[in-house]
Amino acid sequence: MSTTAAATTTTPSTMSNNQGQGQTTIPGTGTGTGAAKTTNRIINNFRALLKDPNNLDEAVNYLYRTLIDDATAGIFIETHHLRKTGNLAALDGLAEESAYRICEMPNLDIFGISTAKKPMDCTCPNCDRLVAAARFAPHLEKCMGMGRISSRIASRRLATKEGTSASSSSSSTYMHSGGDRGGGGGHHAGAGGTDDEDDVDWSSDKRKKKSTQSSRNNGSKKNNGKTF
C-alpha cells in the first residue's frame, strides 16, 4: 500500500517542470512523458495488487460487481427510455401474421392442407350405393328424380306401372267373369292368365263362328240348286 501511495503522489518539482513547459499532467490523459509515467504508475499498482492475495480478491470482486452493475443499469435505462418513447415493441419486431405462417404438422403441407388421400367414392343417401365423386351429382339427380329428364323418366315409369296394374286388374275381372259363364274357355283363360292367351281364345271363337256360317251358306246354296 505504501508503494501505491508513493506511486500516486506527484512531486512539486514535477508540477513545476510541467508548468514551465506549458503542460499539465492529468492521470490517463497525459501525452509524451506524462503518458509514460501514467502507464508506469498503472503497472506498478497492478504489481502491488498481485503481491497480496487478499487485495487481488477484493479487486476482482470489485471489478465483477462494477461490470454487473454497469450492464444491469444500461439495460434498465434503455428499457425505461424505450417504454417512455413508445418504442418498446420495436425490440420484438412485427408479429408474423397467421396467414403467412408455415405449418409443420404431420400429414399437412406448409399451408395446413391435408395431404392424405381423400376417398373418391360417395354413398348415395337414397339408394346407399357407392358412386364416384365425379358422378355423384348426376346420380343423385336421377335417383331422386329432380332433373327434367329424370322427371320424365319417372313419370313414364309411373304411367307404365299404372297401365300394368290396370291391365292386370281387367284381366283378372275377365277371368272371373269367364269362369262363371262357361267352363271351357274360362277355365283355359284362368290357367293361362295373360292378355295374349285371351286374344287367342277370342280369335278361335271367331274362327268357329265363321266356319259355321260358311257351312250354312254352302248348304243353302246346295238346296237352291236342288241337288239331293
Curated annotation (Swiss-Prot):
Keywords: Activator, Chromatin regulator, Cytoplasm, Metal-binding, mRNA transport, Nucleus, Phosphoprotein, Protein transport, Transcription, Transcription regulation, Translocation, Transport, Zinc, Zinc-finger
Matching InterPro entries: SAGA_su_Sgf11 (IPR013246), SGF11 (IPR051078)
Pfam (any one): Sgf11
MF-aspect GO terms: transcription coactivator activity; zinc ion binding
UniProt feature, compositional bias: Gly residues: 180-193
Phosphoserine sites (modified residues): 204
Subcellular location: Nucleus, Nucleoplasm; Cytoplasm
Zinc finger (SGF11-type): 122-143
GO biological process terms, semicolon-separated: chromatin organization; mRNA export from nucleus; positive regulation of DNA-templated transcription; protein transport; regulation of transcription by RNA polymerase II
GO cellular component, one term: DUBm complex
UniProt-annotated stretches for the region Disordered: 1-34, 154-228
Compositional bias (Low complexity): 1-11, 19-34, 214-228
Principal location: nucleus
Record PANTHER family: ATAXIN-7-LIKE PROTEIN 3
Entry text on domains: The long N-terminal helix forms part of the 'assembly lobe' of the SAGA deubiquitination module.
Subunit structure, as described in the record: Component of some SAGA transcription coactivator-HAT complexes, at least composed of Ada2b, not/nonstop, Pcaf/Gcn5, Sgf11 and Spt3. Within the SAGA complex, Sgf11, e(y)2, and not/nonstop form an additional subcomplex of SAGA called the DUB module (deubiquitination module). Interacts directly with not/nonstop. Interacts with the AMEX complex component xmas-2. Interacts with Cbp80; important for promoter recruitment of Sgf11 that is not associated with the DUB module.
HAMAP family (alphabetical): Sgf11
Family: Belongs to the SGF11 family.
The protein's role, per its UniProt record: Component of the transcription regulatory histone acetylation (HAT) complex SAGA, a multiprotein complex that activates transcription by remodeling chromatin and mediating histone acetylation and deubiquitination. Within the SAGA complex, participates in a subcomplex that specifically deubiquitinates histone H2B. The SAGA complex is recruited to specific gene promoters by activators, where it is required for transcription. Required for nuclear receptor-mediated transactivation. Binds independently on SAGA to promoters in an RNA-dependent manner.
Name listed for the protein in its UniProt record: SAGA-associated factor 11 homolog 2
